[in-house]
Amino acid sequence: MKTYLPKIQLVKNGRGVWCLDTTVGCNSGLSANPRGCYGDCYAARSAKLRGFDFSKTVERVFESKAHEAQILKKLNRIPESFVRIGCSGDPSENWCHTLEVIDAIKTTHKSIIIITRHWQLLTDFELEFLADVGVCINTSVSALDSTLVRDRCLHQYNRIKPYCDSVLRVVTCDFNTETVTGARMAEIQESLLSESNVIDTVFRPSKSNPLVKSGIIRTERAKFMSSSMLVSMKNKRAYLGHCGACTEKCGAAFFASRPNPQTEMAFN
């Protein structure tokens, strides 16, 4: 299996989202479950298809000041108002490194979206820095999580609210409530969706997923971008298209009326 390169890159993913991952791969997620988060990590499956070892986390860095300047120039030129950290890895695996990268790109005044499972917890100092920069943190969670993981994610989602924009990114399923497990998970899911500033993210399982095979979650084929994909959709109107037409913008739209902070605080 190939190992990811440590050179940080600003790339547009298949849905049109500009990503600047500070880490790629996810040792924490695959150590907790060999199948990844929710027992079926889409990013891990995609990496495997491309021949990459997703179980090894690789930090991505600026190779030089010239490389850093190149990334900043490219960021300033993209038409989108935000950049996302946490597309093919979880930035929480090394918050210190992630915040150093954010410190470098904050002058672009792009909204910074972080997608995380909070494998490592932010310190109060780190939260104060993020508050000064102005970021939007998406905490990814699901009824598929264990109670321990779900409680950790919910606690962090609430903990960061006084510091920066906090979004609960709920990975949802069409649970079969005629089963005991499906009914229990559906109830948990409704509780998660009742929180404020929630994004409904459709679960994309594999055919071999145990919950699919046992009938606990219902699946269907749906058009996802330009192809057909197996999905489990609680909300049949959930958006599966290109970033450009999405109204939520990974949570940035919830706080669009707020001005971006102008910061002089440095992270070190």
PLM features: residue spans?
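A sequence-composition feature that detects small, non-aromatic residues
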Residues: 32, 43-47, 66-69, 104, ...
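Canonical Radical SAM [4Fe-4S] cluster-binding loop centered on the CxxxCxxC motif
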Residues: 2-62, 243-256
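Conserved AdoMet/S-adenosylmethionine-binding subsite of the radical SAM
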Residues: 66-227, 231
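Short microdomains enriched in Cys/His and/or Lys/Arg
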Residues: 52-71, 266-268
